[in-house]
Amino acid sequence: YHKELKECEIRIAVYRDPIDKIISGFYYCQEFKPGLNSLDHFLDTYPQQLKDNYIRIHCRTNTDMLGPDPSIYTHVYNMRDIDTKLLPFLEQLGGKKIQKTRLREHGTRTITEAQEAKAREVMAIDYKNGWCKELISSKI
């Protein structure tokens, strides 16, 4: 895939902060998977949880979805910047107006420090590869 991607003149990636991604993914999947009732258990059994395709689609790492090297992309956007940065770029590129994104709304989700630490551990590959807001600007 790396070779095919390199052949493209414009290569766009949209990533999500790893902690936000896994926590949001858990709560989204929880709506459709009645057995998911504990974030702690989910984080402790993360590799086994990914065997469920529905959960894998929503909770896998940015690295798994986008590859290990953000610098292969010509344009990298944080999901939070879709409307303010990516949309204007695509409108300029295509010459047409594009509808803004409509993200699902939910109440504030609070997690414990231990859960955040475990989520960071589970998503460590994204921090190593730079798929996080702390490192992305230095990788591209």
Task: Label the model's feature ranges.
Residues 1-118, 122-125:
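PAPS-dependent sulfotransferase catalytic domain
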Residues 120-140:
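Long, positively charged, glycine-interspersed low-complexity recognition regions
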